[in-house]
Amino acid sequence: IVFMKFKGRGILFGIIMVTYMLPTAATYIPSYIILANHQLLNTYTGLIISSSVSIFGIFLLRQAFMQVPSAMVEAAQIDGASHFRILHLVVFPMTKSSFITFGLMSFIASYNNYMWPSLITNDSDKYMVSQGLRSFFIEGGAYGTEWSLVMAASAVIVIPLLIMFAFAQKWFIDGIGGDTGVKG
C-alpha cells in the first residue's frame, strides 16, 4: 500500500490509525462474541487467531517501508518486477530488521498478555505463561504462598525472552534505528 497510488489511500491509513487509538479493552466483548460464534473459545486456534493481526505492526512496517528509497522500487518496476517480487527482493531485505523487531515485540506482548487469554480460556492446559504464574501464586493462598518458588518461577519465565533477545539483538537495534541500506 505504501508504494501503490490509489484513491482513498489516506482515508484507509486514517481508519487504521483510528483503530490503533481504540483501547484494547474496548475490543474484548466483540472479539469474544466472534470467537464464541465460531466455537474458538478455549482453543489454541482462538488464541492464535485473536492475536494474529496487530495495528501496531501495520504502522511499524508501513513506516519501515516508507524508508525504502522510491528509486529502488521504481528501478525494479522498470525491470518488470511484479509487486510481490518487489516486496520479496527489494523491500523485505531492506526492512528485515523491522520484521524481526516486530516479531520480537509481538512475542513479548503475547507472552506477557494476561487479561485476554484468561477471558477466552478456562482449561489449565491452555493457560499462557502469565496465567500459569498467577495460578501458581494463588495456590498457596494468602498465608501459604511459597515466595521463593514464585520468584524462581518468575526467573525461569524470563529465560525464553532473554534467549530470543540475545539472538535477535542485532536486528532489533537496527529495526529501531531504521537502517535503509542506502549510503550517502
Feature locations, PLM:
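A structural signal for multi-pass alpha-helical bundles of membrane permease subunits
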Residues: 2-184
